[in-house]
Amino acid sequence: MKDLHKNGVLILDFGSQYTQLIARRVREQNVYSEILSPETSLDAILSKQPAAIILSGGPSSIYEKNAPNFDYNIIDSGLPILGICYGLHLLTHYSGGQVSSTGEGEYGSAEIEIHIKGTLLQGVRSSKVWMSHGDQVTKVPDGWEVLASSTNGVVATMADKKRSLLATQFHPEVHHTLDGEKILSNFLFKIANCQPNWTAGNFINEQVEKIQEFVGKGSVLTGVSGGVDSTVVAALLHKAVGKRSHAVIIDHGLMRKNEVMECVSALKDGLGVNIHAFDESTTFLSKLEGEVDPEKKRKIIGNQFIFSFDRIAKGLGDIEFLAQGTLYPDIIESGVSKSNTAHVIKSHHNVGGLPDEMNFKLIEPLKELFKDEVRKVGQELGLSDSLINRHPFPGPGLGVRIIGEITQDRISILQEADKIYMEILYEDGIYDSIWQAFSVLIPVKTVGVMGDQRTYENLLAIRAVTSTDGMTADWFEMPPKTLSKISSRIVNSVRGVNRVVYDITSKPPGTIEWE
């Protein structure tokens, strides 16, 4: 089968907050993209047989000490290159031009004036773009021509057509650049001649081949949490190795209400997946007893999952492989990324909470995908819309939604409250408009009045965000009537909660989950 990773786009990451967004925008046009460290050598790049290179933006000035740099031989490699913001500055510098800090940066929405459409700007109708720069080009290199300028006279787009080098001062990957998708499309297909073969169907075929080759005649254990990612992994493994794939759902006591029963029914009855359910709640909760630190809770849950899998696998026969639903954003947030600029935000149970010595060979078939791509794969595999469109659910389950100590009483309170929350979102027809919604039990009690009695009960936070891949998220503007219904029904139905608050924090600065 043709390698989907060849003839794609390699993105050198200079620390931009938008680097992953560039990767997503390229993939949305069915072209494979991969993020690499800026130190990647030309030989290493050529070995991947890319069709083009994109140089990302970044927070540095190119003249700063220790500013990120790259192998400038790439410029003369013959590969089409698109430099964005900091990438434009690097191309300018190494082509003999000049970049300066004038003290007059441009940040936010801006207008540009197009002088020469050329191939890159062909079909571009809107002049609205998104700028985020302090430095600017003050001397255009020989052989380059300016295609567009900002209203302040700053070079906005330029090109060296002979070498297929192109650059923008603005960010075409950001939605605020209204014709950014068209600009990227021109670069991918009219300049770099990329082939749109990064599709869900091709991805499935490639992964099935890889899994079959890797596993051979062996058997695979697939952990299912009830969320979209693990469900898609279970379906993909079932397609690859059939009954030799053992989907295991471990009830760690931290699932949503009725989660285990619903998950088993959907996979077994709907797809014929070989699935087993095990109640391990007593073991998990005893390990978590008294622990309040969120990182330690994640590690405990991750470790216990592997130990439980190991024991369960031995009971199921000779199983040497473990499949996980690790996604690309999981790896990025855990600091296991291509750029040295990454910082650990929080460990994910799939990538940071595992024991050093594992008794399994790990399979992570979705680790290159963003969440929206996972849903497309799920659709291609024949999963129902109700499964595919379920909101993301973390592997540690409610363990990261109970702030502070985890007890059975607190779990029961959160399960019941969250069930009511989801029911109302469905009733009001807004569930599918939200990327992720959930409840969080706070270790704070507040005074209230019910009837003629004073109450002193738990505070519950509810959260709902919109997003496309989980990398960034905005809080969902919940209709006031829906908020009122949620609060009223929870407070009146769930014993132990007397106050509900709504979290209106975006990501960044917050993360989607509280822990």
Would you name each region that the model predicts?
Residues 83, 87, 92:
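Gly/Ala-rich beta-loop-alpha elbow adjacent to hydrolase catalytic centers
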Residues 78-82:
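Conserved pre-ATP/AMP-binding loop-to-beta segment of ANL
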Residues 1-55, 59-77, 93-320, 329, ...:
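RNA-binding accessory domains that recognize and position tRNA/RNA substrates
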Residues 324-326:
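Extended catalytic-interface subdomain
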